[in-house]
Amino acid sequence: IRCFITPDVTSQICADGHVCYTKTWCDNFCASRGKRVDLGCAATCPTVKPGVNIKCCSTDNCNPFPTRNRP
């Protein structure tokens, strides 16, 4: 499977059986910069703390960098 990986947001080959993920959360700059984003791959969908959103998927390049709605 191929997944996008941060910080470069490049598509890389991950190990067989892995899933791609997109993890997003707010930090002190959330209002001005938007949510922080972490893209990667893992053997299983990572568990996250409250306030952190995660989406996992299992097709090539299914975790692109999310677009931010501008006012």
Swiss-Prot record:
SUPFAM superfamilies: Snake toxin-like. One of its GO terms (cellular component) is extracellular region. Expressed by the venom gland. The keyword ATP-binding does not apply. It is found in: Secreted. Keywords: Acetylcholine receptor inhibiting toxin, Disulfide bond, Ion channel impairing toxin, Neurotoxin, Postsynaptic neurotoxin, Secreted, Toxin. Disulfide bonds join C3-C20, C14-C41, C26-C30, C45-C56, C57-C62. PROSITE patterns: SNAKE_TOXIN (PS00272). InterPro entries: Snake_3FTx, Snake_toxin-like_sf, Snake_toxin_con_site, Toxin_cobra-type. It holds the Pfam family Toxin_cobra-type. GO terms for molecular function: acetylcholine receptor inhibitor activity; ion channel regulator activity; toxin activity. Belongs to the three-finger toxin family. Long-chain subfamily. Type II alpha-neurotoxin sub-subfamily. Binds with high affinity to muscular (alpha-1-beta-1-gamma-delta/CHRNA1-CHRNB1-CHRNG-CHRND) and neuronal (alpha-7/CHRNA7) nicotinic acetylcholine receptor (nAChR) and inhibits acetylcholine from binding to the receptor, thereby impairing neuromuscular and neuronal transmission. Ranges of nAChR inhibition are in nanomolar (competitive binding with alpha-bungarotoxin gives Ki=2.17 nM on muscle nAChR and Ki=26.9 nM on alpha-7). This is Long neurotoxin 2. It comes from Naja melanoleuca. The lineage of its organism: Eukaryota, Metazoa, Chordata, Craniata, Vertebrata.
